[in-house]
C-alpha cells in the first residue's frame, strides 16, 4: 500500500501542478515545447503506469505458480522448456568464429552461417527477393537474386525461387558467408554484478544483441563468450549510444529490473554534446514520436493522432557551453526509440556528431529543426550512406573516411566488401550515466539503488 501511494504521488502531483507550472513558466525559467499540455501528458503517463501495474500483477501471480514447477524454466536460455523443445528444430546455431583485435577495432573473420528468421509483419505478402533487397542493404540486389536462384534460401524447408511470396508464420532459412562490420575494441566495464544481474558501461558503437549484419560483435554475444552463459538485456540502448545497461543473468533478475523499468520506477539521466548554444533555462519537450522508416531506424516528431504515434517527454538542462557546442543533461520521462536524439533535433540542437539527425546534406541547413523536413528526400539520402557515401555529421562535416563499398568482392561468396568504419560509424555523444530507483528504503530517504558512470571524456570541459 505504501508503495502504491508513492507511485500515485509521483504521477498525480505533476497533474495537479501542471497548469500552474505552465502559467509560471517564464518566471520560473522553464521553456515548454509541445502541443499537448503537461496536464494531458501526465494523465496519459499515469494511465500507462496503471496499465503496466496490472500486467505486472498478473505476471507475479504466474511466477508464484511457476515456482511450484521450477524445472519448467531453462535458466540458460530464459525459455519455457516446453516451448524450447518445440522450437529446437529452428534454433539458431552458432558456428565457430575468430576474433581479431586491430587497434581501435574488433573484427570477426568471415564465417559460414545459416540465418533463420520468422516472417516479420512488414514482410507479409511480399516477394522474398524484394524483402532481401530492401531490408538487407549491405549487399547489392544481384547478390540476393543469385543466392535465391542457387537454392541457398528456403521457406519452411522448401527451396525458394524469385517468385516466392512470404506469408505470416513462414520460417526463412538463408545459408550465407557472413561478413560482420567491425566495432570498437574498447572494453566493456562492469559497474555492478550479483547472482541475478550485471550492470555494465556499454561502449559506443556496439549493438546490444544480434541484429542485421551483427551477431558476434554484439554486447550479449561478447559477454556470452566471456561468461559461458546467456545474459538478457533489460533496457535498450542504441548501437551508437554508450552508458549504463542492465543485463539479467537469471529469469528472476530479468523480471525484477524489467518490471521496474516498465512501471516507470526508474529515473534515467543522460549527457549529450549538442550543436550550438543551448538555452540556460530548463527546457521540457512534450512531442509525440513515430517510426518513419524501420530499415533506417529513422524516427520523427509527429501529431498524436497519426498512426504509430507515441507520447514522449524529455527534460533538458544545460551544463556548459564552449562557443560552438553545449553539454546538456537529458532526462527522458518516457523510453521511446531515439527519443533524446529526435527531441534535441526538434529544438535545433541535434547531437553534434549524430550521423542521422545532424547531417546537413540530409536535413538542410536548419538540421530538421521544428520537425521540418521532406522525409522522402531524407530517406533517399540516408539510403546512400554506408554504400556510396560515408556517414557525416555537423561536427565531422567533411565526412572523411568511413564505411562504404570498396569496389571489391569476396572471393568465396562474391558479395561486395566494405571499408572499415570511421568516427561517425562508431561514436555518438550521448551517454547514459545514471539509473536510479524512484523508491526509497523503508523509513529513510535513501534510494533503493543507484548506478552511475563517470562522464565520458567528450563531456569534460578543460
From Swiss-Prot:
Responsible for synthesis of pseudouridine from uracil-32 in mitochondrial transfer RNAs. The active site is at 238. The gene is PUS9. Its EC number is 5.4.99.28. GO terms for molecular function: pseudouridine synthase activity; RNA binding; tRNA pseudouridine(32) synthase activity. GO terms for cellular component: cytoplasm; mitochondrion; nucleus. This is tRNA pseudouridine(32) synthase, mitochondrial. It comes from Saccharomyces cerevisiae (strain ATCC 204508 / S288c) (Baker's yeast). Keywords: Isomerase, Mitochondrion, RNA-binding, Transit peptide, tRNA processing. It catalyses: uridine(32) in tRNA = pseudouridine(32) in tRNA. Belongs to the pseudouridine synthase RluA family. It is found in: Mitochondrion. Residues 127-188 form the S4 RNA-binding domain. PANTHER family: MITOCHONDRIAL RNA PSEUDOURIDINE SYNTHASE, PSEUDOURIDYLATE SYNTHASE RPUSD2. It holds the Pfam family PseudoU_synth_2. Disulfide bonds: none annotated. Its main location: mitochondrion. Residues 1-24 form a transit peptide. Present with 639 molecules/cell in log phase SD medium. CDD domains: PseudoU_synth_ScRIB2.
Amino acid at each position: 500500500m505504501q508503495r502504491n501511494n508513492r507511485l500515485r504521488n509521483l504521477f498525480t502531483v505533476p497533474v495537479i501542478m501542471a497548469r500552474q507550472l505552465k502559467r509560471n513558466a517564464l518566471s520560473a525559467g522553464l521553456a515548454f515545447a509541445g502541443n499537448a499540455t503537461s496536464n494531458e501528458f501526465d494523465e496519459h503517463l499515469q494511465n500507462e503506469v496503471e496499465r503496466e501495474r496490472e500486467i505486472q500483477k498478473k505476471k507475479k501471480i504466474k511466477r508464484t505458480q511457476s515456482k511450484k514447477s521450477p524445472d519448467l524454466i531453462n535458466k540458460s536460455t530464459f525459455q519455457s522448456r516446453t516451448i524450447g523443445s518445440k522450437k529446437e528444430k529452428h534454433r539458431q546455431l552458432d558456428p565457430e568464429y575468430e576474433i581479431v583485435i586491430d587497434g581501435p577495432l574488433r573484427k570477426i573473420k568471415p564465417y559460414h552461417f545459416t540465418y533463420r528468421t520468422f516472417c516479420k509483419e512488414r514482410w507479409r505478402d511480399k516477394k522474398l527477393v524484394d524483402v532481401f533487397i530492401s531490408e538487407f542493404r549491405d549487399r547489392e540486389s544481384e547478390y540476393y537474386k543469385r543466392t535465391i536462384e542457387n537454392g541457398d534460401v528456403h521457406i519452411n524447408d522448401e527451396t525458394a525461387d524469385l517468385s516466392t511470396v512470404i506469408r505470416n508464420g513462414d520460417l526463412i532459412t538463408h545459408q550465407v558467408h557472413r561478413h560482420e562490420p567491425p566495432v570498437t575494441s574498447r572494453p566493456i566495464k562492469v559497474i555492478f554484478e550479483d547472482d541475478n544481474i550485471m550492470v555494465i558501461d556499454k561502449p559506443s558503437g556496439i549493438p546490444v544483441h544480434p541484429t542485421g549484419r551483427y551477431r558476434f560483435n554484439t554486447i550479449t554475444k561478447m559477454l556470452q563468450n566471456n561468461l559461458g552463459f546467456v545474459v538478457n538485456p533489460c533496457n535498450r540502448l542504441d548501437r551508437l549510444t554508450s552508458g549504463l545497461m542492465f543485463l539479467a543473468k537469471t529469469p528472476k533478475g530479468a523480471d525484477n529490473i524489467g518490471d521496474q523499468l516498465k512501471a516507470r520506477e526508474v529515473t534515467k539521466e543522460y549527457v549529450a554534446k549538442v550543436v550550438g548554444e543551448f538555452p540556460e533555462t530548463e527546457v521540457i519537450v512534450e512531442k509525440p514520436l513515430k517510426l518513419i522508416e524501420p530499415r533506417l531506424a529513422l524516427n520523427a516528431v509527429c501529431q498524436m493522432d497519426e498512426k504509430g504515434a507515441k507520447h514522449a517527454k524529455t527534460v533538458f538542462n544545460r551544463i556548459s557551453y564552449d562557443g560552438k557546442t553545449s553539454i546538456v543533461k537529458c532526462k527522458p520521462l518516457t523510453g521511446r526509440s531515439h527519443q533524446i536524439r529526435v527531441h534535441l533535433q526538434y529544438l535545433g540542437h541535434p547531437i553534434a556528431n549524430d550521423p542521422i539527425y545532424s547531417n546537413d546534406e540530409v536535413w538542410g541547413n536548419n538540421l530538421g529543426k521544428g520537425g521540418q523536413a521532406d522525409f522522402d528526400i531524407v530517406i533517399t539520402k540516408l539510403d546512400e550512406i554506408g554504400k556510396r557515401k560515408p556517414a557525416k555529421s555537423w561536427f565531422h562535416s567533411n565526412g572523411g573516411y568511413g564505411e562504404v563499398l570498396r569496389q571489391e568482392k569476396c572471393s568465396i561468396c562474391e558479395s561486395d566488401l566494405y571499408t572499415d568504419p570511421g568516427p561517425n560509424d562508431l561514436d555518438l555523444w550521448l551517454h547514459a550515466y545514471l539509473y536510479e530507483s524512484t523508491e526509497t528504503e523503508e523509513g529513510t530517504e535513501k534510494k533503493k539503488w543507484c548506478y552511475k558512470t563517470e562522464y565520458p571524456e567528450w563531456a569534460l570541459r578543460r
